[in-house]
Structures are given as structure tokens and as C-alpha cells.
């Protein structure tokens, strides 16, 4: 039997140094930690970690190699009222494991107990941590380092984007390899996007409730092991092969000049509430990892049963180590943080929260793009506009106001102008720049763009909750017919609204984020919460792509790059050459016009580009300002000879002109 020596208290997790493996595990309240190793037949051998430095338990196993499967059993007090739920009958995943073998199938042995510890051994039902080999040939890979002002984000799901792509070999569809395939690279370049933002690719599992309904967690916001690659998206599902396949995709995307941003769920874990399974953190040090109420229950500020305590020094270290792994070992270019108010809780939200300060101090993390979803469901959870530099934020005000203007006729141009100007009322503070405003009209969470113009209500019956889940208010408009059908007049109106929303997104100051599939006309048939639909409802049907809409979207992105006012990282000032606001007569907007109910606006950008908006329900005449103006693609041909002085704007229409 091999013997462990003391080893070292860092780095976190299991690290192969060429001669053996160093194991570390944080637990402030444990009394004993056993390292459990598994051979090819599943036989378990246990070793007590021989050393403790502060609250880190550690040991070194000479001769151990990558591919070794392991877990932990952690001994300590069972005192639920104090937040302690140690149960050595439960094999636990290493929170810092960079590989996990096996998937979670709901099994009663996975539950640690509520009032008393469950004595059943979960070994045969529990996925295993895997020692990984971090050596990888990155060749001459370098980050594209796209300036924020030039950034156009494309939010996508690994499987949904590529599962039905006809030009990708069947064995690679729905995988990391597909992302780096020449067919996908060509698609990204055709659109002109600069950053691929991927929904979670860290190891996750399906909630027990979904499994019992015969459904699966598709989106991935139920994290099991945040440092480990999700193997279900790999063409070769062994953890090491999956990790290297992901790295291959990143390398290929970088060669094409495309950044990779990962959606990360640093707010809760798959252990859910007190009735949920015990996989890792609950059994390792429940009181340290989670926000615990006075009675020992969890603060549920995420809506998922538990909330990570990211003000605890050890949990901050855990989060920082996780992010650094993805940047330094996988070369990702940034992160989008789900329910990110949790990251700043102390428990009150603070701009100088420990995790934020640690991220700003870290050389690797301060050099990548950091984007937050600036809310959670806890007290004071809505924090839009309140994040410190260098964070950018999803701007739900842009999403809602643009939908309300174009689809519901509920706003006038004053509010629209504010959103076009990078929502300066929200973000122009604390030294932040316009790129901190991430504009979106749709995201994975909610209606697709096509569904926004095709459905008044959500249709989530397939989710198994009798349509109770998902947002009730979507600021959508079916244009007179509920569903994808309808006559030609309905389709024409929908097309106009779609074009207007895309133009608003891509021709506004700030960082635009396009939901993958919106450029194709992808529909989820009214499901605005398709988190559990891993099927044709969410997979893109490339054979049905709306080529006209694809061309329109790509042309808007090309147009955006030509307009300095949209790509410069400085706030607009009246008459500074960046922007002038004009009325339908081509004259400067008067103060009383902004909120007078008018729904027409002209925006002169960089003294040469004129964006005209007609939010009325009928064709309206808009007089262009003095000069020779020609409409530009996608609103006219490349060599448009027609000089216009008046634009007869169609209902809910947009056009862009260039001054000769």
C-alpha cells in the first residue's frame, strides 16, 4: 500500500508534478479528512491526509499519475443548527477537481440527511474526481485582445448551436470540436462577431425533480464542479480528452480572431436546499461555503436553494482559483457571471466586496473581460449600474425599453435616446466607460427574438410546471396572431419589428450582445424558459435559417464598425462631433420634444452617419438635415446613387444614411 507524505498546502486541488500528485482540501471545521482512491474495478482505498496547514488539509502521493480517480470523506460534527453537516458515509467531489468522471443519476444514497446523518454509502452512485494532466501544446496561441469598443458578443449554447449543423461531421455535432470546426469559424466571421459567449461548460448535473420528470438540465446553471470541464459536450467523453478538446476549440477560435467568454455560476451549487443531495461543499465545510441562517438553514438569494458565501476568505480563494484555472490553463478571454449580486454580498452588496477586490488585484483576471448579470433575488438584489470597474453589466433597461418602444408603443424617444447613448443615466459614474453597458434585446433566458414578435404569452407547458415557470411580462407583441403563423401583413410587421430591434441593438453605444439564433429567425415556439429542453426546440435548425435576416444582421455589424462614435470608449457630449439629436424636421431636438409623446428621432453620429427612427404605426415623413444623404447597407445597395432629402419611413422602421 502506497503511503502519503505531508506534501504542500498549495496549489488547490490535485496537481501532478511529474513524479506524483499533491492533494489539498480546505475545511475549517473538519476533524479528519480521508482521501479515497479508486482502481479500475472501482475498489476503494482510503488514506488519511497526514498534514494540516491552517484550514487546508494536504498530502502527497508519490507515483500517482493523471487519470487517477479519487474523492474525499470528511469527518466532523453533525450539528445542523450550527450549520455543520459532516457525514463520512458520503464520498465527496473535490471542489477544485479539474476532471469529473460519471454523471449524477438521482439515487437516495446521494442524500446526506436533514435532521440526522444518512448512513448509506454513496460510493457506487457518486461521480469521481479525476487527476488531470495540465500539459498541453498551445503552440503560438495568443489572446485576440479585442478592444471593448470593437466587441460584439454572440451568446450561444455548445450543443444547441452545432447539434444540427449540416456541414459539421455527425460525430462532432454538439461538441467543443464543432465550435472550432471551419464551418463554424466561417459562420462567426460571416456575421462579424468578435466574442463567443458560451453558456456553462463547467461540470453540472440535472436536478432530481427534472430527472423524475424525464427531463434534463440543458442550460447548465446547476454547477457540480466549477473547475471541471463538462464532458457531455465532448466527442471523446473522458475528462482529459474533453478538456483538451475544449482547449483545441479555444485555440482555433483565437486563430480566427474570436474571443471566448464563459458563463460561470459563482452563486450556488447543485446541492440545492436542505432536502437536496450532498455532492461536495455541504459535506466538506457547509458553514464556510454557504450563507447560513441562524437556524442552520440556507439563505436562498439565488432561487436555487443555497447561496455561496463569497465573502469568506477561503471561498474567495476557491473562486479566484477557479477563474484563474480557466484563464491560465484554458486561455479563455473573459467571464459572464450569473446572478452576480451574490459575488458582492457581505451579506449586503458592496462595491469593495472581498471577491471584487481580489479579482481587481489579480494580474490574470484583471486582464480579461468581466461581465455580470447584476441582480439576484435576495434583499437589495437589483444592482444594475452599481458594479465597480472593471466590470461590464447586462443592461435589462435597454432590453425592456427597446421592446416597449418598438413592440408596445409605450415609450417616447427620450427614453430611447438615453438607451442608445449607453444608458449614461445608469453607467456614467465611478469612472466607468460606455462599454460597461452590455446592450441586449434577448438572451438565453426569455423569448428568442422571433418569439418576441410572434407571441404575447409564454408557452412553457413542455417544462412540466403547467406553464407557471418563466417570466410573465415579456414586452412582446404577436402582431395579431399568436404563434409563428399568420398572414402576409402579420409577417411583414414582424419583419419590420425584428429589423428595428436588431438595428437598435447594433447601432447603439455600449457593448452589443446578440443571442445566437436571432440572426436566423430561430424560435422556441413561445417557450421563454427552455432550461430543460435538450431537443429540437432549442437546437438550431440550420436548414430553416432566414438568409435575408442573416445578411441584414451581418451588414449591421459591418456598419457599426464604420461609425467611430459607436466604437470609441468615451461618453457622448452634445455637439462634440459624436452625436446630435434631431427631430423629424431635421432640426435639433428641443427640450420639450423629448417627452412629448413623439416617436420619431434622427441621430447624427460622427457628423456623417444618420440613424433615423420611425416608431409610429404608419408611414411618416422625416426631413433629413441639410446635405447629400444616401442610404447605406443593409438599407440600400452598396453603390446607392440616390440622394435623399426626405425619408418616408415605414411603420416601426429604421434607416441609416451616410453624408456624401
UniProtKB/Swiss-Prot annotation:
Please list the GO biological process terms of this entry: glycogen catabolic process
Where do Basic and acidic residues bias regions lie?
460-472
Specify the superkingdom: Bacteria
Classification via InterPro entries: GlgX_C, GlgX_Isoamylase_N_E_set, Glyco_hydro_13_cat_dom, Glyco_hydro_13_N, Glyco_hydro_b, Glycogen_debranch_bac, Glycogen_debranch_GlgX, Glycoside_hydrolase_SF
User: Which SUPFAM superfamilies did the record assign?
Assistant: (Trans)glycosidases, E set domains, Glycosyl hydrolase domain
Q: Where is the active site?
A: 338 (nucleophile), 373 (proton donor)
Keyword entries, A-Z: Carbohydrate metabolism, Glycogen metabolism, Glycosidase, Hydrolase
Q: Where is this region: Disordered?
A: 460-482
- Where is the site labelled Transition state stabilizer? 445
Does the record carry Repeat as a key word?
no
Q: What is its EC number?
A: 3.2.1.196
Q: Which reaction does it catalyse?
A: Hydrolysis of (1->6)-alpha-D-glucosidic linkages to branches with degrees of polymerization of three or four glucose residues in limit dextrin
> Into which EC class is this enzyme placed?
hydrolase
Pathway listed = Glycan degradation; glycogen degradation
Q: Which GO terms describe its molecular function?
A: glycogen debranching enzyme activity; hydrolase activity, hydrolyzing O-glycosyl compounds
Q: What name has this protein been given in UniProt? A: Glycogen debranching enzyme
This chain is encoded by the gene named glgX
